[in-house]
C-alpha cells in the first residue's frame, strides 16, 4: 500500500512555531497555513501528492555479507523515492529531499513561464505577483515547513534563521540560494537552486563536511535535480519527466582530467597577477571556455561532463561574493561526492568553518590535477600533491 509523505498533500498544521526571537532567530515568513497550502497546490504543475514507492517495486542491488543484505549500488531508471530508500535509512531526510523535489519542479514551471520586463521577471504566487527569485524563496520555505523535519532554515534572500517548527533531535537545518543566476532569467540562460542540509539546529559553527546532503535544481532545456547524500557514493542526476516524476539518469563517481574551464570574477586578474597567470595558462593550452555567469550550470557541467574546473578568485579590488553557507559548501559536497575536489586556495571548502551566515570565500572546483594547478599557481604549493585520486584531503 502506498504511503503519503507529509509534504504539501496533507494540509496538516506544522508544529507550533517558537515566538522567541534573537538577533539571528526570527519567526518564519508569515504564511496562513491553510491558504499557503492552497497556494502551493495551485502553483504546482501537477498538484499530485508525493508518494513513496511500494516496497515491492524497489530495485535495490544487494550484496550478501554474513547473511545480511546491504545496498551497494543504485540503478539508472529508478524513481527518486526508490533511490532515496537505498541512499539513506533516515526517513526524515528522505522526506525532506522529496519535499524539496516537489518545490523544485514548481519553481521550474514558474521560471519557464515568467514574464520579464525591464527590471524583473515575475510570476504569480496565489494572488501575488512576485519576482521569480522571491517566489522561489517562498516555495522552498513552504516545502521545508511542510516536511515537518526541518528545524531551522535560511536563504540568501532571508539571511536569518527561520523556525520551521521541526524537531531538534532527528531534525535538520537547511540553507539555500533560491534562484542562483536570477539576473540572467530574462536572457533565457540556465539558472538553478542550491541547498545544503545539516543535522540538528545549527547553521553556524559548522563545516560543509557536516552536511548530510546537498543538491541543485537546474532549470534549463532540461529540468534536473542533482543531489549527493553523505556516506552514499556518487552524485546523482534526476530528470523531471513529462508526468512530473523524477527519474535517475546519471551517476557521477569520478571527475577526470580534461581541458574545460569556467573562470568567474575575471576582473580580479587586474590586480591578482597569479590569477592572471592561471587564466593565461588555460588560453595557451587551448582549454575550451564554458562559462555562463550562472554558478549552477557552470559547476554542474563538471559533474555532467566529468571533467574541467570552475574558478572564482578574489583580489584586493574584487572581493569575495560567493557565500560559503548558501552556495560554496553545498556545491563542494556535490563535487567531492562525485570524485572531484574543491579548494579555497589552501584547503577543501568542506573544511572551512561557517562563522557567520554571510561568510564569503573564493573557490575552485574540479579534477585533482586542476585543483593542484590552482593552488600551486596562486599560492606556490598544494596540499593535494601526494594525495591519491579518490582520497579527500
UniProtKB/Swiss-Prot annotation:
It is found in: Plastid, Chloroplast. InterPro entries: FBPase_C_dom (IPR044015), FBPase_class-1 (IPR000146), FBPase_N (IPR033391), Fructose_bisphosphatase_AS (IPR020548), SBPase (IPR023079). Mg(2+) 2 binds at residues 156, 177, 179. Keywords: Calvin cycle, Carbohydrate metabolism, Chloroplast, Disulfide bond, Hydrolase, Magnesium, Metal-binding, Plastid, Transit peptide. In continuous light, by inorganic phosphate, sed7P, glycerate and ribulose 1,5-bisphosphate. Substrate binds at residues 180-183, 291, 321. Disulfide bonds join 116-121. Belongs to the FBPase class 1 family. Homodimer. HAMAP family: FBPase_class1. This is Sedoheptulose-1,7-bisphosphatase, chloroplastic. It comes from Arabidopsis thaliana.
